[in-house]
C-alpha cells in the first residue's frame, strides 16, 4: 500500500510539473516611466492568458491610466483602498475581448499586496480590459473582503517587481475626484515574445 501511495504521488507530481510554466514579465511603458510586472500563469491561468492576449495582439494601443483612488477622494466608501486603474476605459471598445472567468484569490492564493496587479470588474465574470495596481496592502479586495458587496473580491494575477516609484507618481498625479486630469498615457505594454507565446500556445484556458 505504501509503495502504491508513493507511486501515485510520483505520477501526480509528474503530471502537475508538466503543466507549470515560467512566470513571464511584462513592462508597462508610461509617460511617467516604466513598470515591470511578473505574471503568475500557474496560479491565475485564465486572467494571465487574457492579459497576454491584449499584449500580444496590441489591444492595449491607446490605453491609459485614468483613475487614482486615494484615501482623500473616496468619501462615500466605508472601506477605503489605494490603487491606480488603467486600460481601454470603455467596455465596448472595439479592441476589447469578451469578459473572462473570475479567478478569486481563494482559488489562486494571490493576495492584494503592495504592487499587486488585478482586474477591475462590476459583477463577477465581467472583467475584460481594465486593471489596477495596489499601493500598499489591500486585503479588502481579496475574496471575502468588503470593498465589493458580493464578497467575491477581485482577480489578482501578478505583482510589480520594478517601478513602484512610477506607480506612486501616477497615484499622486493631478486629479478631479478619482479621475486623472490629464490621463497618463500607456505608451506600450510588452514582454519577451517567447515567454508570452509559451503561455498563449500552451496554457489556453478550457473554461
Across the structure, where does each feature detected by a protein language model lie?
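Cyclophilin-like peptidyl-prolyl cis-trans isomerases
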Residues: 17-207
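Sec-dependent N-terminal signal peptides
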Residues: 4-16
Amino acid at each position: 500500500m505504501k509503495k502504491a501511495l508513493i507511486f501515485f504521488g510520483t505520477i501526480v507530481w509528474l503530471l502537475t510539473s508538466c503543466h507549470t510554466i515560467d512566470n513571464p514579465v511584462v513592462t508597462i511603458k508610461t509617460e511617467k516611466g516604466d513598470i515591470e510586472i511578473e505574471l503568475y500563469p500557474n496560479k491565475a491561468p485564465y486572467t494571465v492568458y487574457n492579459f497576454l492576449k491584449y499584449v500580444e495582439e496590441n489591444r492595449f494601443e491607446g490605453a491609459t491610466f485614468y483613475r487614482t483612488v486615494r484615501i482623500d477622494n473616496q468619501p462615500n466608501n466605508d472601506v477605503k483602498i489605494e490603487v491606480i486603474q488603467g486600460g481601454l476605459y470603455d467596455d465596448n471598445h472595439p479592441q476589447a475581448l469578451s469578459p473572462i472567468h473570475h479567478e478569486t484569490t481563494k482559488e489562486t492564493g494571490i493576495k492584494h499586496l503592495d504592487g499587486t496587479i488585478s482586474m477591475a470588474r462590476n459583477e463577477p465574470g465581467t472583467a475584460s480590459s481594465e486593471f489596477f495596481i495596489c499601493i500598499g496592502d489591500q486585503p479588502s479586495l481579496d475574496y471575502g473582503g468588503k470593498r465589493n458587496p458580493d464578497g467575491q473580491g477581485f482577480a489578482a494575477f501578478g505583482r510589480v517587481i520594478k517601478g513602484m516609484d512610477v506607480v506612486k507618481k501616477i497615484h499622486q498625479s493631478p486629479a478631479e475626484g478619482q479621475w486623472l486630469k490629464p490621463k497618463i498615457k500607456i505608451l506600450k505594454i510588452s514582454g519577451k515574445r517567447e515567454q508570452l507565446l509559451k503561455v498563449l500556445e500552451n496554457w489556453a484556458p478550457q473554461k
